[in-house]
């Protein structure tokens, strides 16, 4: 029997952490972060980690598990998340995956092989190389490769191209989990307003000092490439004013949110909820209850 898990995804600033905590309290659960940046110690504000009070109220996993000088990949996430979910389940609790790194979460849910002859990073690099292509361009690649896909969709096209490229199906046919995937969304203007406001709050909380610490110590590491830090480096180098760097960060975050939504919409089977609608949290909790009772 597959392990039932709750997955909460969505763009940045939409309220994933708050919902995950509420779900954990309601259904005796623990939260597993599905965020590629929250793994780094010392990067708290720019990665929007759950506050110490929130982490004290509900146990969070895969936060602060790497130093800023260490790398972290989808391979690492899948390996560690699997062990974490198994531990949570063994204690009779519900695992709630919450985050915005679509590649990591999709890799976990679809049961990608972590062994085999083809290096996992090579597989992920190939998948990432297909992301910029439009549906029409993917269809053309499929045709060029001599492949046939009944009822074309983006996911089928990418899987077919992957199998043709590597000569084997690199996904497990049997996954470990039965997920309920909830994707939070908001009206675009409202979401962008939330993003801008959250960036302002981050600066008030000390983001500039946190980013300067990273800039002074390790400006070229993987951790420094995440949105929330690298946009401020031109300011530290004297190439931009603070106002310019702040606006650059807000713009980059808005663009990132758009890419996140595109990923979840095209690559994962999610149930969308508009956070601005009346009674949305009650409807989400009811759906989770029905899913767990089924």
Swiss-Prot record:
Residues 35-38 are annotated as: Interaction with substrate tRNA. Its EC number is 2.5.1.75. Belongs to the IPP transferase family. This is tRNA dimethylallyltransferase. One of its GO terms (molecular function) is ATP binding. One of its GO terms (biological process) is tRNA modification. The record marks 101, 127 as: Interaction with substrate tRNA. ATP binds at residues 10-17. Coiled coil: none annotated. Monomer. Signal peptide: none annotated. Catalyzes the transfer of a dimethylallyl group onto the adenine at position 37 in tRNAs that read codons beginning with uridine, leading to the formation of N6-(dimethylallyl)adenosine (i(6)A). Keywords: ATP-binding, Magnesium, Nucleotide-binding, Transferase, tRNA processing. HAMAP family: IPP_trans. Substrate binds at residues 12-17.
């Amino acid at each position: 029997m597959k392990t039932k898990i709750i997955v909460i995804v969505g763009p940045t600033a939409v309220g994933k952490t708050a919902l995950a905590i509420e779900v954990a309290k309601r259904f005796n659960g623990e939260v597993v972060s599905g965020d590629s940046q929250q793994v780094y110690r010392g990067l708290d504000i720019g990665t929007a980690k759950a506050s110490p009070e929130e982490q004290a109220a509900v146990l969070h996993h895969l936060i602060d598990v790497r130093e800023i000088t260490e790398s972290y990949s989808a391979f690492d996430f899948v390996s560690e998340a699997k062990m974490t979910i198994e531990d949570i389940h063994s204690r009779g609790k519900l695992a709630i995956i919450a985050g915005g790194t679509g590649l990591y979460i999709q890799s976990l849910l679809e049961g990608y092989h972590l062994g085999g002859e083809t290096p996992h990073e090579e597989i992920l690099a190939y998948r990432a190389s297909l992301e910029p292509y439009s549906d029409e361009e993917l269809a053309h690649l499929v045709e060029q490769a001599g492949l046939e896909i009944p009822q074309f969709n983006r996911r089928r096209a990418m899987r077919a191209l992957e199998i043709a490229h590597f000569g084997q199906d690199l996904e497990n046919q049997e996954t470990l989990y039965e997920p309920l995937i909830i994707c939070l969304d908001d009206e675009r203007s409202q979401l962008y307003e939330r993003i801008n406001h959250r960036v302002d709050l981050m600066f008030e909380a000390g983001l500039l000092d946190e980013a300067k610490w990273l800039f002074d110590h390790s400006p070229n590491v993987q951790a420094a490439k995440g949105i929330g830090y690298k946009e401020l480096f031109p300011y530290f180098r004297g190439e931009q004013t603070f106002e310019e760097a702040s606006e650059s960060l807000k713009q980059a975050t808005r663009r990132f949110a758009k890419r996140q939504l595109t990923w979840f919409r095209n690559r994962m089977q999610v149930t969308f909820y508009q956070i601005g609608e009346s009674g949305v949290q009650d409807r989400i909790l009811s759906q989770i209850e029905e899913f767990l009772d089924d």
